[in-house]
Design a protein with these regions (language model features):
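Patatin-like phospholipase
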Residues: 1-158
C-alpha cells in the first residue's frame, strides 16, 4: 500500500466528475498509479471507492504544489511538456487540439513557478505517445539533469 512505502509517496489523479485533483497518500499503490495514468480517450477511468479517476496530468502535469503539500522543502521538477505546436488551427479538431495545448501550457507554467529547480529535457521531436523514442528520451533527461547538477548539489549542500 502507499502508506507502507519506505519513502513518502503521493500519487495525483483527477476525479472525473468534479475535475479536481486528488492526492492519494493511502490505499492500493497499483490502483492509484493506474488512476494517475488513465489518459482520457486512451484508457478507461480507474474506479476507486465508487469514483472515477483519470490522468493527474490534467490538473498538474508537473505536480509541484502536491509535493509542497506533502512537506517537500526542495522540489526538483522535470518538465517534459512541449510548447503548443504552431499548426493550422482551422477546423474543429485543429482548434480543439490547439486549445488543449494552450491550457496545458498555462497549468504547467503555474505549477513550475513553485519549483526550486526545473529540469527541461530537449524532447522537441518526440510526442507523448512516441514509445519508440523512449531511450532517446531517457538520454535527453540524463543530459538535462547533468546540466543542472551544480545547482542541484548547491541546493542539497553536497
Amino acid at each position: 500500500s502507499i502508506e507502507q512505502m519506505r519513502i513518502p509517496l503521493g500519487i495525483v489523479a483527477t476525479e472525473l466528475q468534479s475535475g479536481k485533483g486528488v492526492l492519494f497518500r493511502t490505499g492500493n499503490t497499483g490502483l492509484a498509479v493506474r488512476a494517475s495514468c488513465s489518459v482520457p480517450g486512451v484508457f478507461q477511468p480507474a474506479v476507486i471507492s465508487g469514483k472515477e479517476y483519470v490522468d493527474g496530468g490534467l490538473v498538474a502535469p508537473v505536480p509541484v504544489s502536491y509535493a509542497r503539500q506533502m512537506g517537500a522543502t526542495l522540489v526538483i521538477a522535470v518538465n517534459i511538456s512541449s510548447e503548443p505546436v504552431h499548426q493550422d488551427a482551422s477546423g474543429t479538431f485543429g482548434i480543439l487540439q490547439q486549445t488543449i495545448s494552450i491550457m496545458q501550457r498555462s497549468i504547467n507554467e503555474y505549477e513550475l513557478k513553485g519549483a526550486d529547480i526545473v529540469i527541461q529535457p530537449q524532447l522537441k521531436q518526440m510526442g507523448g505517445s512516441d514509445f519508440k523514442s523512449r531511450n532517446a528520451a531517457i538520454l535527453a533527461g540524463e543530459a538535462a539533469a547533468q546540466a543542472q547538477m551544480a545547482l542541484i548539489k548547491e541546493k542539497l549542500k553536497i
